[in-house]
Every structure is written in C-alpha cells, then in structure tokens.
C-alpha cells in the first residue's frame, strides 16, 4: 500500500508588504528584501494581526526561481505573540514572474508558490503550532502575500 499524506487547512496569513529593496547581483542571483508592514491571521480557532516588522528575504536565481525566507510575527486576538519563519519557493512562466515583479496582477493558479512555515510561541493555547508540520499555499499580489496554511496530519 502506498503511504498517503493528508493535510487540513488551519488558517490564512495575509501579510501587507512594502517596496522592494534590492542588494543587487550577489553571484548566485539577485538578493531582494521586502518589508512586512502588517496584516491579519484568520482561521478556525485562531485570529489576530501580523505585526509591522520583519521582512521577506529573497534570492532570484538566474532561471527566475525565487527562494524566499520570511521572518516576522503575529499577535493573536487573545494576546499570544507567535514568531514565524517561512521558507519557500515561487516559480512559473518567466513572463508571469516578470509581471509580478512589476506589481501587475497574475492569476495565482499559474504560479507555483509553496512555503514551509515554522512557528514559535510560549503561549499555552498555541503550543500545537510547534508540535506539527505545516505547508503553505501562497499567492503574491502587488501589496500583499496571502498564505493558506495547512497542517500535515
């Protein structure tokens, strides 16, 4: 019997983002830094706000594959602060990736954008975030990134 992998949707992170800062070509690609300005977290049993600090650190490889590593935090409505490290990749047809870079709309279904969020918190209500693996299915918009977070069962 082939093993299966099941997931369940748990919440959505909508992170508002600022203007891109480029550190230029670093030998392995172009380094970009995108500030996280705030946002919201919404799901069953968890809701709150993305705190206005942190950033998404990216390298755009020569083949246009984008490697991402975002570090930020959110605060739940009941006062828990949750630190987030979210690594992932974004890839698709070059012409669509170029549109995204220019802030133009692109159908998210046409871009492969997946992440592996990790969470840390000392709040007892949210220890489960540190006791499971999660996968994010994400979409990039001109002013925000939307990540649907799924728990691996």
UniProtKB/Swiss-Prot annotation:
InterPro entries linked to this entry: UPF0311
A Pfam family it matches: DUF3237
Family: Belongs to the UPF0311 family.
Family matches, as NCBIfam families: PRK00872.1-1 (NF002045)
PANTHER family xref list: UPF0311 PROTEIN BLR7842
Protein name: UPF0311 protein Rpal_1987
Species of origin: Rhodopseudomonas palustris (strain TIE-1)
């Amino acid at each position: 019997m082939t093993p299966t992998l099941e997931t369940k949707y748990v919440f959505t992170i909508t992170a508002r983002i600022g203007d891109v800062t480029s550190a230029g070509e670093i030998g392995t690609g172009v380094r970009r830094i995108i500030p996280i300005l705030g946002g919201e977290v919404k799901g069953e049993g968890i809701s709150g706000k993305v705190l206005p600090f942190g950033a998404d650190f990216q390298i755009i490889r020569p083949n246009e594959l984008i490697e991402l590593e975002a570090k930020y935090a959110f605060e739940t409505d009941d006062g828990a602060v949750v630190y987030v490290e979210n690594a992932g990749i974004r890839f698709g047809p070059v012409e669509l990736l170029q549109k995204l870079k220019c802030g133009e709309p692109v159908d998210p279904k046409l871009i492969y954008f997946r992440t592996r969020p990790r969470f840390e918190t000392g709040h007892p209500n949210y220890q489960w975030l540190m006791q499971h693996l999660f996968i994010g299915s994400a979409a990039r918009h001109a002013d925000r990134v939307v990540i649907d977070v799924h728990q691996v069962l």
